[in-house]
């Protein structure tokens, strides 16, 4: 349940005056190199490949710090010279898991011609050094010939439809983007459908037919086609010539028709622009959408005009609206619940507004200056994995003499935020924040920030999303993790050695914790440990799965031991050890302390929906005043509702003695 606006405002006011935080945190782009990148999620992390490096493989546990495993081939395979005799390298890999193996579809081509071919290589395991790792080339899949074909066999991308069939999109210029059906077993073109479907094409004379790099993904029963438009690959001294951008459309069938948000067919020149040049980030394109546990992400390259002027990659969330259209979220800079405002979708009412500026004290070294004019707007699409009450930690600078005001709209709900002077412009110490209460949905959320001119102004750096915990953390609200997944019933599953991340957990909203319980099924041994800050951080709560009591519906309740006085804002890591197979976890439940009043029962359990009032604090944490409770001095059995991930309750009758 929501805690109510009064409760959230209470926490916000308490922090606004006294907040200190465990550590300053400034985002920093990792500048991972890559061109035409492809990524895949596997159980222990991520794999990444890109163009012109003989299918060089990188792996990462967190999609931020990457390990180079070198090239997976020594050069162009011999078969490829039959179709592209003058090819000079391997382009545009696409990593996809099908038929029990990891396959990399790649292409060879003669630049500027249609003498091109697509082939693939495969391995059972994608982690070097593990059992089953080792690449085998399977040769030719599809080809085109210059002077004969009006499309080009490059830039392959594989997708699985809702019926279990596999398809491969490809193409560049000419007739644009094509689609063929694949045989899942062989990996080659299917024998039961030899059609080459034209699914996207630039038709205007001005465009020159410049469309390539298709990527397909299914979401909520519809198919999304992302393509790259315009001029690519000019970098270094020629970076200003690059006009590359990312467009998309969607369809109800994998074979199309794909239409943009305005209803125009992509096969007739349509397409909605998702990403194009902004600030230092030139030519964001050549990307691929992929499924990452509980979110869809998009990896693409760009050229850094303020740095080395060469290619690097960004990984972003794709954020879907309620009517299932895609918007592009933040580049991933190491955290899931933070948004750098300079990476938002910027609408300028006048030229010179919303200027991306540099500062050594700004997160990632950049911020938005001149947030001045009514009608200018910053839109931040965000994927949120746990629905509920949040505080938006609004990091700003106001070098004026009086407070500025901004309009903050969260999923259509507007509020006005006051931003007092901070003493200087362009500097952003961690104390220069205000807290904005908001209720967020699970899935796509859309935050819009606008100046509300009153003659005073404020610059913006970053928004952090802090989740307020009343009595429950749902396991399936995790931000990411290793050796974890969501089942078809949306339940959280974890294997031995796995962990899940819960960022920015506000623990000050918990008061007088009596017991902590974890809902579990499908496991009777091993331990779940909740840790502070990292996967091997200090243990906060330990839940021994061998000590459980049956709740019903297959669920058991495990009583956890640990620090019942936990406070502050924490990143919590849920870690698993000693588990056989896979454990299904429900909610982590914080039960209020059971106390007595005059040796007699005094009333009802404290409700998770009760509001709270702020209490002054000098400790740097948020202090919450005791909640008022109703009491009638009668022995009345109260019912404590335990809920599984589907919201079904397993009621356990208990008796409370409440002190007030």
Name every feature range the model reports, one short phrase each.
Residues 359-377, 385, 424-428, 487-501, ...:
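Extracellular beta-rich ligand/substrate-recognition surface
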Residues 403-414, 526-535:
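Short, surface-exposed beta-strand/strand-loop-strand elements in extracellular ectodomains
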Residues 612-660:
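C-terminal outer-membrane/trafficking sorting elements
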Residues 273, 412-442, 535-569:
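Extracellular carbohydrate recognition and processing domains
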Residues 21-355, 359, 393, 462-529, ...:
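Carbohydrate-active catalytic/glycan-binding domains of CAZyme proteins
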Residues 400-401, 522-525, 636-638:
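Short proline/glycine-enriched turn/loop motifs at strand-loop junctions of beta-rich domains
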């Amino acid at each position: 349940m929501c805690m109510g606006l009064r409760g959230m405002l209470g926490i916000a006011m308490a922090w606004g005056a006294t907040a200190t935080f465990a550590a300053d945190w400034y985002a920093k782009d990792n500048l991972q190199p890559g061109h035409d990148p492809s990524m895949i999620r596997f159980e222990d992390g991520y794999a990444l490949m890109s163009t012109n490096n003989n299918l060089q493989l990188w792996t990462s546990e967190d999609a931020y710090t990457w390990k180079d495993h070198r090239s997976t081939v020594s050069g162009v395979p011999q078969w490829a010279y039959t179709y592209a005799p003058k090819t000079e390298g391997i382009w545009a890999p696409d990593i996809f898991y099908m038929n029990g193996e990891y396959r990399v579809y790649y292409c060879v081509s003669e630049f500027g011609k249609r003498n091109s071919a697509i082939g693939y290589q495969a391995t059972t395991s994608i982690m070097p050094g593990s059992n089953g790792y080792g690449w085998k080339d399977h040769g030719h899949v599809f080809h085109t010939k210059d002077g004969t074909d009006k499309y080009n066999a490059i830039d392959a991308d594989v997708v699985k439809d809702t019926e279990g069939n596999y398809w491969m999109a490809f193409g560049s210029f000419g007739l644009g983007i094509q689609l063929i059906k694949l045989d899942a077993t062989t990996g080659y073109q299917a024998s039961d459908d030899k059609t080459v479907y034209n699914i996207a094409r630039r038709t205007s004379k001005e465009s020159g037919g410049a469309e390539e790099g298709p990527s397909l993904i299914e979401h909520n029963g519809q198919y999304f086609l992302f393509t790259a438009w315009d001029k690519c690959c000019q970098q270094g001294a020629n970076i200003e010539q690059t006009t590359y951008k990312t467009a998309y459309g969607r369809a109800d069938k994998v074979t199309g028709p794909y239409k943009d948000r305005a209803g125009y067919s992509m096969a007739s020149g349509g397409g909605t622009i998702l990403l194009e040049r902004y600030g230092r980030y030139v030519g964001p394109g050549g990307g691929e959408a992929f499924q990452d546990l509980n979110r869809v992400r998009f990896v693409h390259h760009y050229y850094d005009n303020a740095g080395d002027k060469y290619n690097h990659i960004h990984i972003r969330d794709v954020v879907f609206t309620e009517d299932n259209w895609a918007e592009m979220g933040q580049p991933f800079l190491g955290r899931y619940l933070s948004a750098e405002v300079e990476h938002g979708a910027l609408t300028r009412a006048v030229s010179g507004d919303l200027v991306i500026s540099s500062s050594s004290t700004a997160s990632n070294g950049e911020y938005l200056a001149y947030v001045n004019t009514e009608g200018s707007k910053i839109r931040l699409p965000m994927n949120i994995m746990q629905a509920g009450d949040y505080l938006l930690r609004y990091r700003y600078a106001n070098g004026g003499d009086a407070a500025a005001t901004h309009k903050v709209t969260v999923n259509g709900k507007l509020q006005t935020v006051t931003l007092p002077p901070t003493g200087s412009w362009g500097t952003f110490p961690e104390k220069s924040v205000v807290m904005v209460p908001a209720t967020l949905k699970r899935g796509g959320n859309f935050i819009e920030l606008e100046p509300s001119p009153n003659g005073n102004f404020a610059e913006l750096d970053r928004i952090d999303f802090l989740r307020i915990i009343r009595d429950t953390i749902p396991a399936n609200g995790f931000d990411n993790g290793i050796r974890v997944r969501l089942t078809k019933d949306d339940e959280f599953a974890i294997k031995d050695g796995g962990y899940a991340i819960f960022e920015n957990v506000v623990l000050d909203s918990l008061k007088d914790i009596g017991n902590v319980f974890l809902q579990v099924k499908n496991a009777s041994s091993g331990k779940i440990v909740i840790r502070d800050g990292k996967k091997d951080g200090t243990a906060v709560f330990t839940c021994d799965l061998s000590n459980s009591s049956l709740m019903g519906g297959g669920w058991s309740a495990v009583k956890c031991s640990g620090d019942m006085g936990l406070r502050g804002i924490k990143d919590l890591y849920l870690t698993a050890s000693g588990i056989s197979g896979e454990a299904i976890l429900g909610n982590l439940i914080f039960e209020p302390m059971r106390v007595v009043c005059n040796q007699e029962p005094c009333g009802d359990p404290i409700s998770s929906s009760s509001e709270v009032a702020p209490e002054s604090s000098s400790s740097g944490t948020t202090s919450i005043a005791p909640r008022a409770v109703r009491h009638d001095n009668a022995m009345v059995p109260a019912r404590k509702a335990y809920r599984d991930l589907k919201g079904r309750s397993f009621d356990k009758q208990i008796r409370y003695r409440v002190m007030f």
